């Protein structure tokens, strides 16, 4: 009888465990993207300026426009002066009630002195929200020693995907702590959710973003500061190499709006309902299946990239 009751107890625990994770999975999709209402970001931020790194292209540019729409003054940090000027012009033409500033900064090869100068410039304004968006992707997936561009590119991807998010957070947090309000959103990638062969450095660098965000959230959770990671899957941008939208590949404007609507409701999410469904479904499969899926996807991506390069060469 005791053995029977023990077996029943173990069975009940297993069922409850499975039920808990099932409800958690459903809620991470429906609760976050259907039932929760967006918070007033500007009110929660406690200051009028939003800083966006890599804000002249793709997701970063769409974040800049969406935050301007929500009443923030916009401070863009990016590399190319002409793109910064053009983006500023476009935002101010559409949202004349906001102020737009920019700082020209190359995140691939800065010194600590360069970062100190940048942070001094940024801290001249009251920053309510920081979006650490700047990132770099390899030309196509490949074994580490075969990376196009060699160790220079490997170094750039590693540095650009980890250092800016760390140093800008460290440099801007003091004014948020003093106000006891502020929002930091760190843009990672679904690539950080699994050990991805042929994406090793990129995947590892995006896992760093997740881990750092989680640690910072614990450090500052009682100081009125929201710190959240957004880990998207495929978005139609120049960086991703995909320009056509689909059910699981939204345009950057759609993604940015959806992602910002999740801020304040969770510690980490993909930012888009269909991406969240993808991730929750993939999490149900064993690692060997994911490895096979990643391998197939990597081969297809590499073949497309090489074919595109060959076509350009022929032209």
Swiss-Prot record:
<feature type="active site">
    <location>
        <position position="202"/>
    </location>
</feature>
<comment type="similarity">
    <text>Belongs to the short-chain dehydrogenases/reductases (SDR) family. 17-beta-HSD 3 subfamily.</text>
</comment>
<keyword id="KW-0560">Oxidoreductase</keyword>
<dbReference type="InterPro" id="IPR002347">
    <property type="entry name" value="SDR_fam"/>
</dbReference>
<protein>
    <recommendedName>
        <fullName>Putative steroid dehydrogenase 3</fullName>
        <ecNumber>1.1.1.-</ecNumber>
    </recommendedName>
</protein>
<dbReference type="GO" id="GO:0005783">
    <property type="term" value="C:endoplasmic reticulum"/>
</dbReference>
<keyword id="KW-0444">Lipid biosynthesis</keyword>
<keyword id="KW-0521">NADP</keyword>
<keyword id="KW-0443">Lipid metabolism</keyword>
<dbReference type="InterPro" id="IPR020904">
    <property type="entry name" value="Sc_DH/Rdtase_CS"/>
</dbReference>
<dbReference type="InterPro" id="IPR036291">
    <property type="entry name" value="NAD(P)-bd_dom_sf"/>
</dbReference>
<keyword id="KW-0752">Steroid biosynthesis</keyword>
<dbReference type="GO" id="GO:0030497">
    <property type="term" value="P:fatty acid elongation"/>
</dbReference>
<dbReference type="GO" id="GO:0006694">
    <property type="term" value="P:steroid biosynthetic process"/>
</dbReference>
<dbReference type="Pfam" id="PF00106">
    <property type="entry name" value="adh_short"/>
</dbReference>
<dbReference type="GO" id="GO:0016491">
    <property type="term" value="F:oxidoreductase activity"/>
</dbReference>
<feature type="binding site">
    <location>
        <begin position="47"/>
        <end position="76"/>
    </location>
    <ligand>
        <name>NADP(+)</name>
    </ligand>
</feature>
